[in-house]
Swiss-Prot record:
UniProt EC number: 2.4.1.18
Protein species of origin: Prochlorococcus marinus (strain MIT 9215)
Enzyme class: transferase
Entry annotated with the keyword Transferase: yes
Catalytic activity: Transfers a segment of a (1->4)-alpha-D-glucan chain to a primary hydroxy group in a similar glucan chain
Cysteine-cysteine disulfides: none
Function as written in the Swiss-Prot or TrEMBL entry: Catalyzes the formation of the alpha-1,6-glucosidic linkages in glycogen by scission of a 1,4-alpha-linked oligosaccharide from growing alpha-1,4-glucan chains and the subsequent attachment of the oligosaccharide to the alpha-1,6 position.
Name this polypeptide is given: 1,4-alpha-glucan branching enzyme GlgB
Amino acid sequence: MIETIQADWIKSEAINLENCCNDNPLKILGPHFYEEQWVIRVWMPEADEVKINFKNNTYKAESINHKWLFEAILPENPNFNYEINISRGGITHTQHDPWSYREEWMGEVDRHLFAEGNHHHIWEKMGAHLIEEKNQKGVMFCIWAPNAKSISIIGDINSWDGRHHPMQKRLGGIWELFMPTMKEGDTYKYEIRTQQGHIYEKADPYGFLHEIRPQNGSIVSKLKNFNWNDSSWISNRDSSSQINKPISVYEMHLGSWLHESTDNKYLEDNGEPRDPVPAADLKPGTRLLTYPELTEKLIPYVKDRGFTHIELMPISEHPFDGSWGYQVTGWYAPTSRFGTPNEFREFVNKCHEEGIGVILDWVPGHFPKDKHGLAFFDGCHLYEHGDSRIGEHKEWGTLIFNYSRNEVRNFLVANLIYWFEEFHIDGIRVDAVASMLYRDYLRPDGEWIPNENGGNENIEAVKFLQQANHVLFQHFPGALSIAEESTTWPMVTKPTDMGGLGFNLKWNMGWMHDMLDYFEIDPWFRQFHQNSVTFSITYNYTENFMLALSHDEVVHGKSHLLHKMPGDDWKKYANTRALLTYMWTHPGKKTIFMGMEFGQRQEWNVWDDLQWELLEFEPHKGIRNLIDDLNALYKNEAALWKNDFDPYGFQWIDCNDKSNSVISFMRRENDTNEWLVVVANFTPNTHGSYKVGVPVEGFYKEIFNSDGSRYGGSNKGNMGGKETINYNIHDYQNALELALPPLSVSIFKHLSKK
């Protein structure tokens, strides 16, 4: 054993390693050239004996200055081509040296782009990556934690003992370690020691797979190992703007759409049953469906209904079912509740094969305080603001991202690109945008901080949203970016180069509240609230609006859509059909929440599944038939979608018949005379000869009637259509004399010939 004048230094470094306080293990560990010799130092806690295997020779490593620090002398530079033979408690195994890999994984260009917030593929560097270096397979770990005192990899590989595998701190607060002993499927966390000496066990913010709740470790997973066959879909999607096409969205929550008996286990490809993931105590003996089962059952169902897109409530990994997915801890991982990342890829792939787009709810506005998550990540407020007046949603119990920090914005923007690139999704809906835009959102006076100009706008969040949308459309020009924004913030759907937020669709929350308020009123009193049903057109062209009846409107005592309606069951069904038909004829893209398509009666409950048994009853079948036919009509009649955002596409015929609660309007595609006339009767009265003015004489075919018997209605109508009569009304010389069924919406199409 060579003598060294650095004995005290080596002993000090070894003590730091034992106490998990060393941020530079490569300084002492691995191969070093010293006094004309190659020295290898190995850190092996609780090892009894260590040997080095190199070029068919074995060299004993002696313990130096610390019982777990071993040193051996080799005759030449070993590079990466040696192995360590370790004996512990009578058990011997051989492995490569984690500290023999000395090159930086994250290079200068990567660090620079990340530091300025512009590394749009940062997930290809951060996190856990299965790689092969110098013929040795293993896992490269990389994490950003600039304020940590030390970080170790912990997992089954080392009995979750942070003393075994300290990471190397690099420039820019990056930590790295190559683990040649780890493989796909291994569970791990980062053990982070703070400057104050506290120890946190954190899941990987960039992890591609996590354990099923209640466990919360990260799992080593391959990234690029799926064969897509949707290239034509992606090409068509990105060749033109999607907002000028029909968009009808089925919003849903994967965990509460349909449950399965725990006795009926999902079988893996090898025939082995998969451990079931229990649904909830509310329905003992039931389990969640897997991604493959959802592929088999959900996609045909949505296709049969005629929806163009599925919108999934958040599927990023989250620990608490009751958050509905909106309190995310695993931003780069589809939740393991339903299966593997590749199984989710196959779900998206199959959606595209069947002509269905996939929209994900994305939650960049806040994150939970779970100890294994982003909160106080490296002992400091790294991802969140330190001041709770700008860094916390107290009402929600969550933290707010610090959008002024480049690396935090990079984490989020890259995450957005990740879902499109790695999972081929077609759109996002950004949740709770208003909570991001305003510093005083849900805050009383004295509990928020004005911006630099003294206002309540969150300037940093605005810039983040603009950056996210700008980058998204740079990479994926055919993407959908939908804002759930509940205020009158201007230019939400205007391009960023015009000063807008850059979304291309915005949920019309005003329309939704007005319509639900209107339909909850007894029909006999609706005449006093006519403005509620007509007001939306006055601002309809200020943004690119999507009409949404979402999950938020069927929870927390609000009742499901059917039970919001007044009157007996017949009137509830008729009102529901009338509202849905009016929605499909009103300008704007469409979104409804699962269960509305067949008249769910109970409020949505995340722990339960839908009331599928209701489809045994004709009125509920009728509502589902209505949705099927509305979606078919919607896609076939360009007048219903082509000019959603152009005033040319809509014209009132009469919006002032308050006493009858009747409205009528036209939808137009182009300058031909084949427009649609829509007439809505929002009372139970039947009108036998109601006159509606039209601009051109001829035959108007009745192409839809929400009162049809197929939908559970009374089947009153106009015998297939009407010829105009010479009658001056509504500033037109021609009119249709129509039968208006009770609580109904009828659609007529002008034809050049009968």
